Every structure is written in structure tokens, then in C-alpha cells.
Amino acid sequence: MNTVATVFTRTLPLLIAVTAWAQQSPLVYPGGHGPGRGKHVVLISGDQEYRSEESIPALAQILAVRHGFHCTVLFAVNRQTGKIDPNTIDNIPGLEALRHADLVVLFARWLELPDEQMKEIVDYTESGRPIVALRTSTHPFNYRKHPESPYAKYSYDHKQFSGGYGRQVLGETWIAHYGAHQKQSTRGVIPAGMENHPILRGVRDLWGESDVYEITALSGDSRPLVMGQVLMGMDPASPPDPAKKLMPVAWTKTYTGSSGKPARIFTSTMGHVMDFRNRGFRRMIVNACYWAVGLEKKISATRSVEFVAPYNPHPIGVRGVAP
């Protein structure tokens, strides 16, 4: 990993070409002009279903080009082929980038990384630096083959370290689908008292194809920012399901690790690849990145969150599609 793929482009074909030859290297979008200039964001794509290998680079482009953040994108890479492979759960090259990161955007699901890679994530987590976590990141790790690993306690269903990384660090672990998967979508409802939170500045008409995840009780000092209303169909005009109550789909909390420094955490259980087509969702995630690094006073309700390159993602499913 001596090579770094540097991409600063408005065209998807160039992104595809660079990714094709640089899949063992981080994908880097240098920060442009904007309030985020000087902040380094490392974005990790490591889920098997929701096409984060397509949505996360698109988010990184927005953060870099529209807002000035320097962005490094890391992917799950097949050890045999050297290609991006979301179904690979034991290899995310380039995690050394976390040593110099100001923020991590995490999109992971049931990874079982080797100890030397997991150490980079845990060291970052314990350092007091912030995390923005999406969708399946409530259950990012699952140590089944190597329960002897010192990092096995971060498994989503760990009993002693209750709920593993998801519950302890981010606020909740995997419980169940609450809305019917791929049949019921989510309308975001902002609860009373949260309307003026900086993360929600300019956020309107929040909707996504994600089904609502079940939440038992958010841990620590978690504060729900958005509640998810289960809709009867996969259209924003679908009526609410009268049998379903509201569940948190976005919240903030702090996590204090071994450094003794409290870290800002933002978690959303939305994050379906099609959710990113919703401007309100994109703005919420971009705003969360500002808030996480202490730039909440710089959040604008009108600064562009439009895609830099055409965004025509593949449908979700447990298979790999290299960006």
C-alpha cells in the first residue's frame, strides 16, 4: 500500500477507471475550498448488502468538492483477486489512515477483521475522536471464526461487553427489522425540541427506502434526533403503518474510551444506497460530519449537497458491485 489513488473528478467514468487499478490503495479526494478544509475524513465501506461501495465514494466526493474536507475511502478487498468485494469480511486495507484522521464515517456489517486491522479501528475509537455511523454499523463486527481474538468482545451479540461495538460505542446493536424489509420505507419525523439542532439545519422531507430497524433502548447519553415512521410502501407518499410506533433512526451520543476524552458520535440506521438520492438525508449526513468535528457553527442550510458525479446505484443485495 505504497500507492494512493488520488481522485478529484466530476465524472464517474474516471472514478471507475482509477478504482480499477488502485483497489489495494485508499481512494483519496483532496479537500477543495469550504468550511471543512484542513479536516481529514476517513470513510470505511464494509457492508455486504446496502451498496456502501457505491454510496460512500459519492458521499466522499460531496464532502471534498462541496465542503472542503480531505477524504480517504477504504473498501473491503478480496485477498485473492485484489478487487473490491463487499462480501469480503476479513480485509480492509489502508486502515493506517485512521492514525491521522479527524473523523471516521463507518458503514460496516459483521466484519471479522484480523487483529492488526481491528487494532487501528479500536485505537481510533478509544482516542476520543468522532464517528459518524450508518445503517448496519450498529452491528459492524461478528467474531465467529476467531472467538479467541482480543477484539471478539466487539461482536454485535457479545454478552459481557453487552451488544458489542454497536451498543457500547454507537448506542445500539442489531435487534431486528421493524418495518418489512424492502416492502416498507421510512419517513423521518423530527421530534419536538430537536428542530433547531445543527445536524438538522436545512433538513426537509427526510425519506428513504431503508426499512426502520427495531431499537430496544439507546445506551448512554443518546439523544434521538429523528424518529422513523414505518410507511406501508416504498414510496414517500405511502401512508403510515398504523400498527407501528416511531423508532429512533438518527441520534447523537458521546463515547469515552481509554483516553478519557469524550468523542462525539452520530448514528443513523438509515443508509440504503437509494436513501442517498434523498436530499434531506444527504444534508443530514453532511451536517453530522460538520457537527462531529466541532464545526456546527459552519453548517449552512443552503450549501450544496448535490452529487458531484452521476449517481445511479445498483439495487441492494448480498453481492458485490465495484464502483
Task: List the predicted regions and their residue ranges.
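N-terminal secretory signal peptides that target proteins for export/translocation
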Residues: M1-V7
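Bacterial N-terminal signal peptides
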Residues: T9-A20
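Helical hinge/lid and interdomain linker segments adjacent to catalytic or ligand-binding clefts
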Residues: L27-G32, V42-I44, Q48-F141
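A glycine-rich, often tryptophan-bearing local segment used as a flexible ligand/cofactor-contacting loop or short
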Residues: L106, W110-G202
